Amino acid sequence: MFYETLKEICQKKNTTPSAVCLAIGISKSNVTEWKKGRSPKLDTVVSIANHLNVSPARLIPKKEEP
């Protein structure tokens, strides 16, 4: 899930998902939606990745094989 991956990366970078939202200029309410399982738009993923200095692919959870 996107939120879990984001949270893990944020912990390693000593920040929070809410702080990242504020830094890139989007509403903190997005965090609540991500916690519910929604995924952000691609441009948001890219902005978050740039802010955290990670690859956008790192933020996108891999699909589990059946």
List each model region and its residues.
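Residues in the helix-turn-helix
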Residues: A19, N30, R58
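Short alpha-helical "recognition helix" segments of helix-turn-helix
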Residues: A19-C21, I48
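Recognition helix of helix-turn-helix/homeodomain-like DNA-binding domains
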Residues: G25-S39
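A short, Lys/Arg-rich alpha-helix, primarily the initiator
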Residues: M1-N14, A19
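DNA major-groove recognition helix of helix-turn-helix/homeodomain DNA-binding modules
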Residues: D43-R58
